[in-house]
């Protein structure tokens, strides 16, 4: 494995080899740059330049995508092994108190250009340009000796057409050193921690406050004893006591105080009420109703006798058919006008005949 060969991942598809060369420009001499489908390899001349590229470009945005920069490991990159060994071979940039303030910077000077110039005096660990104040920058060195060397040798150095001024920062020794994540370059702000990471690591909430509370609760009511004792008590005693005491006490007043007096006191009163109420009318068991029901029914008449004499089929209808017709004759004679004298003898003769006929019918009846 070469310490000067770097792997670059998550490269946008529209990026070209010239774009990669311009992106890493200012970090020493680039010997080779190979661009493939979504990743590539960059080889520099000096191992220190390779280390700076890893520290400064890891997670940096390139043409709309955050790239991954790691030391190359053959044809395949092994990120797990890199994380274990990168701390020793490629330590992250550290913030020190050996800081110089650079003034009169050109607008075209970047932090990469400033860092390349400061390497002439020593090993810069952190550089920044135009971040807080336009036209000013900051440089930190790993040792105080490198800082003193840069202050004496590079003060007045011309960078992109302007001579810069270097002076020591008096407040650098009193400021606390910020913690910089290893994934990002030193001049970038630290990444925000996620609540999920604190939750997985077991923060104060879970370890100190919440879990002891659960342990205390479980210490009073273990899971096994709760199932063995409480549930058994509920099944054996608790449930039986509830049924025997609560529900039986609830039903006992109805059985002892309400229902029993109802059978002994209320029903006799109800009988007395009925007897007093029935005084005004005969009861079902009085003598009048017994005599009425014991009386023999009236004799049944024959249907033939009850029929009308004019009803066809009756005995009276067949016995005197002529009598009924003759009885209607005088009625018809009364409706007629008065007869003449020649007809009166005949009418008297008929009357005699009718009288004899009526007498005969009466005798037969």
UniProtKB/Swiss-Prot annotation:
It is found in: Nucleus. Residues 316-332 have a biased composition (Low complexity). GO terms for cellular component: cytoplasm; nucleus; spliceosomal complex. The keyword Repeat applies. Residues 6-69, 100-166 form the RRM domain. Residues 195-307 have a biased composition (Basic and acidic residues). This is Pre-mRNA-splicing factor srp2. It comes from Schizosaccharomyces pombe (strain 972 / ATCC 24843) (Fission yeast). The gene is srp2.
């Amino acid at each position: 494995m070469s310490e000067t060969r770097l792997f670059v991942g998550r490269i946008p598809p529209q990026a070209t080899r010239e774009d990669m060369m311009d992106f890493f420009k200012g970090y020493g001499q680039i010997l080779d740059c190979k661009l493939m489908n979504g990743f590539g390899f960059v080889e520099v001349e000096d191992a220190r330049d390779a280390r700076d590229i890893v520290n400064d470009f890891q997670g940096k945005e390139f043409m709309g995508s955050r790239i991954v920069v790691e030391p190359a490991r053959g044809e395949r990159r092994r990120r797990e092994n890199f994380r274990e060994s990168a701390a020793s071979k490629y330590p992250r940039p550290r913030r020190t108190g050996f800081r110089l303030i650079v003034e009169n910077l050109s607008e075209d000077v970047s932090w990469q250009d400033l860092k390349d110039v400061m390497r002439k005096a020593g090993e810069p660990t952190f550089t920044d340009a135009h971040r807080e104040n336009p036209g000013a920058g900051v440089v930190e060195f790993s040792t105080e000796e490198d800082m003193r060397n840069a202050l004496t040798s590079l003060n007045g150095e011309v960078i992109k057409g302007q001579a810069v001024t270097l002076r020591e920062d008096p407040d650098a020794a009193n400021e606390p050193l910020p913690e910089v994540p290893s994934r990002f370059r030193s001049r970038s702000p630290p990444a925000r921690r996620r609540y999920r990471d604190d939750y997985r690591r077991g923060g104060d909430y879970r370890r100190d406050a919440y879990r002891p509370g659960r342990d205390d609760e479980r210490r009073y009511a273990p899971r096994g004893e709760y199932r063995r004792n409480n549930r058994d008590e509920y099944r054996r005693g608790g449930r039986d006591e509830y049924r025997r005491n609560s529900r039986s006490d609830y039903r006992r007043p109805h059985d002892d105080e309400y229902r029993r007096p109802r059978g002994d006191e209320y029903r006799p009163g109800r009988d007395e009420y009925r007897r007093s109420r029935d005084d005004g009318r005969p009861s079902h068991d009085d003598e009048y109703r017994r005599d009425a029901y014991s009386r023999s029914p009236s004799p049944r008449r024959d249907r033939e006798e009850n029929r009308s004499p004019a009803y066809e089929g009756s005995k009276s209808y067949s016995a005197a058919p002529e009598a009924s017709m003759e009885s209607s004759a005088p009625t018809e004679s009364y409706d007629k006008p008065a007869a003449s004298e020649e007809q009166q003898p005949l009418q008297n003769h008929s009357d005699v005949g009718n009288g004899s006929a009526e007498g005969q019918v009466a005798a037969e009846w």
